[in-house]
Amino acid sequence: SLANPGIRLYGAMDAKMYAEFTERLAEQTPGGPIVIALTTMEGDPEIARSMADDIRLLRDRGRREIIFLGKTAVYSAGVLFMAAFPVSHRYLTRATKLLVTENKRAQPMELAGGSLRSVASQLEHAQREIQREIDQEDEDYRAISEGSNVSIQELREKAPHDWSITASEAKAMGLIAEVV
């Protein structure tokens, strides 16, 4: 139940949280719904996507009802994880804030010296990598907005400015099923 989640996750969405998540998921008794409570203010988007994939696979292949309960803070990578759940299975506690952010490059780009053709090749590779990351971000925005009143375009426009959304605003936008 929402009052007693089977899995409680708190902290950075990192390899440690992922290990805890998979361990707790494996401990769940077969049958009924699984409620996952999450509080996170930071994290690795790739870890969040991996956790989201686990949820999708379990829901689609394992035929399990899985419910998301955001508590206090669901920032950035946490919102990516929340996107794995259909709107009808997303809940936030009253004081919870969502933070939708734009992906940032973790490392600066450096070009090795060499011939102009070599440098041009490096630039082309970097451009393809950046485009792949932009495409992934659009997929993330699509998952976040699916079933809601928020468009992908609105996410693209507001995410670069770190869009903070209260639980009641998220409900009004159709991003969640209910505020609890």
Language-model-detected regions and their locations in the chain:
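Terminal-region recognition feature
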Residues: 1-180
